[in-house]
C-alpha cells in the first residue's frame, strides 16, 4: 500500500452506489456535484464511506485513493449513458484518482451516520477503530484546510 503520512489531509466522501466504486477502480475518477462540494478538494487522499447499498460492506470505510487533481465538467460528460438525466447539464468536479487501495482493517461505523464529507488526517485514519475516531477538532481542521490552500493559519 502506498504510504499514508500522519499529516496527509484526507477527504472522507460518502459513496452511495456500487457503480461509483467500480468507476473509481477501473476509470480512476470520482464525481462530486459542485452544489454539494466540500470546502476544498486539494487533499492528499479520498476515502470512501460505503452506504447500505454495499451490503456486507455497508457503513464502513474500506477503500481510499490518492488524489491526483480535479477538473470541472458537466455530468453528461462523465456519464455519457445518461444524456437525459435531470442533472445532465449541472457542473461536477471530476476528481482524478490513483489506484484504489483497500484498507487492511476496515473502519466501521458502530451506528448509522449521516454526513456527506468530512476531513481527517493520515494519522487519524491509520489509528481509527471507528468512524468517530476520524474527527479532527474544528480548529485543527481549519489549520489543515488553510495549509492546503497555501494560506498561513
Predicted regions located by residue number:
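Structured alpha/beta reader/binder surfaces that contact nucleic acids or chromatin modification marks
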Residues: 2-153
Amino acid at each position: 500500500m502506498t504510504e499514508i503520512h500522519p499529516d496527509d489531509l484526507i477527504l472522507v466522501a460518502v459513496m452511495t452506489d456500487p457503480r461509483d466504486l467500480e468507476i473509481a477502480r477501473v476509470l480512476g475518477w470520482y464525481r462530486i456535484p459542485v452544489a454539494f462540494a466540500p470546502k476544498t478538494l486539494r487533499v492528499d487522499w479520498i476515502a470512501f464511506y460505503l452506504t447500505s447499498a454495499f451490503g456486507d460492506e455497508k457503513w464502513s470505510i474500506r477503500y481510499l485513493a490518492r488524489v491526483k487533481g480535479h477538473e470541472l465538467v458537466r455530468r453528461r460528460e462523465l456519464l455519457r449513458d445518461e444524456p437525459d438525466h435531470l442533472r445532465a447539464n449541472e457542473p461536477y468536479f471530476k476528481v482524478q484518482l490513483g489506484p484504489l487501495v483497500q484498507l487492511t482493517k476496515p473502519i466501521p461505523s458502530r451506528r448509522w451516520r449521516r454526513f456527506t464529507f468530512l476531513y481527517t488526517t493520515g494519522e487519524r485514519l491509520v489509528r481509527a477503530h471507528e468512524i468517530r475516531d476520524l474527527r479532527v477538532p474544528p480548529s485543527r481542521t481549519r489549520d489543515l484546510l488553510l495549509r492546503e490552500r497555501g494560506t498561513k493559519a
